[in-house]
Amino acid sequence: MASRLLDHLTAGFTASLVWDAFDNYHDHEQYWTIYGLIRTGLRAFTPKKRYYAQKQVFRFVRPGFVRLGVICDAPDLRVLAFSSQDRQQVTLVGINTGLAPLHLNVQLIGFPIELRQKQAAYYRTSETENCHCIGRLPVNGGNWPFTGIDAQIPPACIFTLTTLG
């Protein structure tokens, strides 16, 4: 489901919605749908993995953000970038579809110096994590030649790097 959301954003769509937010019964078709973001129980509703994967985008790509160009040579790494119109905030969302960990170094070219002095929060959803904050990374790393946001991306995960508070 997160991959489809990235497909839509890549194609130029500016919004997305979830039709069935939770698993539910359709009287007219007389069947249960199980495509929701939230699992329906007798007395509890539980977020599914797809909820946390969608949260990586919905929480950190704010209304009014614009999509940025990204150059990524890794075939198993899909990355989209967004910034506020004043270029004071930036959010990158990506998916490592491969079976191996990847090294990611993000160079923010043409952004104000104030942004380059911030830190980026690193969130990840994987088999064992649910939009978990891994930590904070400097936007301007000091490890030459990796002078941007420097992150290790494990296999089969969706991640977000964001300068939002």
Model-based region annotation:
Residues 18-22, 95-97, 125:
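Active-site-proximal beta-strand/loop segments in catalytic clefts of secreted hydrolases
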Residues 139-165:
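C-terminal beta-strand-rich structural cap/linker in extracellular carbohydrate-active enzymes
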Residues 26-27, 102-103, 162:
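Short helix/loop capping segments that flank catalytic or ligand/cofactor-binding pockets
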Residues 3-6, 77-81, 93, 147-149:
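Generic recognition of flexible, low-complexity loop/linker segments
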Residues 14, 50, 88-90, 102, ...:
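Structural beta-strand/beta-sheet cores of well-ordered domains, especially the beta-sheet scaffolds
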Residues 73-115, 156:
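Carbohydrate-binding surface patches
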Residues 1-59, 66-77:
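Aromatic/acidic polysaccharide-binding cleft in carbohydrate-active enzymes
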Residues 101-135:
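Beta-strand-rich binding/interaction modules
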